[in-house]
């Protein structure tokens, strides 16, 4: 059984470096998806550079998401501010979901019993005490500390349910896993 750590990347180079170093001993592969578009649909330059992460080069599966989703709602000049806001929110979610679902291309060589971790780059699970071989649940939700954008902005008494772990055979899509709520699944810190 291998462990694939899968997430999207935008410009969080420091957090990416921290994540790779913390999870390196537990993870077999890091699946990193970077998009040529931001969530507003603007074209952007790719910034991921494998030269900055040579230590992890053999573990990194780097994918570039080139496409915009097909179901983007066109903004019209006659739309009300409310409609523009709703369409913009919808479009941003569709772009994010398409980028996250692109993770699937990095899992083509994964076996059905391999563990797939789905999260954002800044949601770093604590894998120190997790024995995936002993867990019988189909889905695991990680209970994580919440930091508001920076490591020094810890929010006490607030629990974040971020990373999801699931065997490949049970994974419908990366976004499906992301949307799972923690109500009926075991939680790990």
Language-model features and meaning:
Residues 1-25, 33:
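N-proximal low-complexity "stem/linker" segments adjacent to membrane-targeting elements
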Residues 3, 24-38, 55-61:
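Short loop->beta transition adjacent to catalytic acidic/histidine clusters or analogous donor-positioning motifs
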Residues 10-13, 36-38, 67-70, 122-124, ...:
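Short, solvent-exposed loop/turn segments at secondary-structure junctions
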Residues 11-15, 22, 99, 113, ...:
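Short, glycine/acidic-rich beta->alpha junctions
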Residues 27, 57, 113, 136-137:
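Short, well-ordered alpha-helix to beta-strand connector turns
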Residues 37-118, 127:
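Active-site-proximal specificity loops/subdomain of glycosyltransferases
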Residues 93, 123-189:
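Conserved catalytic core of nucleotide-sugar-dependent glycosyltransferases
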